[in-house]
Amino acid sequence: MPAFDPEFSGGALMDINIYNIHYVVGLFGKPKNIEYYPNIEKEIDTSGILILDYDRFKCVCVGAKDCKSPIANNIQGNNGCIYVDTPVNSCENLKVIMNDGTTTVFNENKYDNRMVSEFMEFIDTIHNNDLERCYKMLDHSLIVSEVQTIARKKAGIIFKSDIN
């Protein structure tokens, strides 16, 4: 499988952890420092912990292709947390849980398929020739790619495509 093949620039960071990176960068922007601690088997990271440092707080992103556990995404703060029990690329049933136990649930997904809203935004961007939105999303993608590249290179994960 390409996800586990260094010949195809695979691995957990490149595959499953990309969703976490998009999520965190979308919320907080570019981190100040990036570290990745992979578990390497047969020349590929089958899982790993990515730590993104934002000076005042840290984000820990776990991506694993070698095991399975219940999905849990938490953003913890002084007054409570934001909890999502679905993959970050769908963010269904986002719960704001305050320290006093008060819970508010949000679900902005209007469609059964998580991709519908994204495709509708693409269509809207194209039809309205919204170059500002286009470049904003491009900048986001470039930061995500930079985070991913720095993380794997600092962890010593080098692909053949890096050498050529």
Describe these PLM feature segments:
Residues M1-I34:
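Predominantly a Rossmann-like dinucleotide-binding segment in NAD(P)-dependent oxidoreductases
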Residues A12, G48-L50, Y111:
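Glycine/small-residue-rich pyrophosphate-binding loop that anchors the diphosphate of NDP-sugar donors
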Residues K32-N33, F57-K58, G80, L131, ...:
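Generic structural signal for secondary-structure transition and capping sites
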Residues N39-D45, Y54-D124, R133-D139:
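NAD(P)-dinucleotide binding in Rossmann-like oxidoreductases
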Residues F4-P6, T103, N129:
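Short amphipathic alpha-helical segments at helix-loop
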Residues N17-Y23, T46-G48, E118:
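Internal, well-ordered alpha-helical segments in soluble enzyme and binding-protein domains
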Residues D124-N164:
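C-terminal helix-rich "cap/oligomerization" subdomain common to oxidoreductases
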